[in-house]
UniProtKB/Swiss-Prot annotation:
NCBIfam families: PRK14422.1 (NF010997). This is Acylphosphatase. Its EC number is 3.6.1.7. The active site is at R25, N43. It comes from Corynebacterium efficiens (strain DSM 44549 / YS-314 / AJ 12310 / JCM 11189 / NBRC 100395). It comes from the Bacteria.
Amino acid sequence: MSMQPTDHIRLTAFVHGHVQGVGFRWWTRSQALELGLAGSATNLDDGRVCVVAEGPEDRCRELLTRLGEQPSRHRRVGTVSTVIEQWSEPRGVEGFTER
């Protein structure tokens, strides 16, 4: 496992709303890669999408803003009603996957 810079952080965001079957995970991946973040976007059985992103804290916070902003300034697909965030230490993930 590679060492992470101390300013790196892990964001886990549970996105509620109409976010499955609309290209939301693809959009999230494109935004995360644009920001230089690693992680994943995963459909959950209850209709939410779980977004995990690791990287510099300011970029993770920017992704969080993009996930929930109303109206979206970044052409976000779907309709987001709520985003629940959790912060933790990074685990050293690489790339960004849609699951």
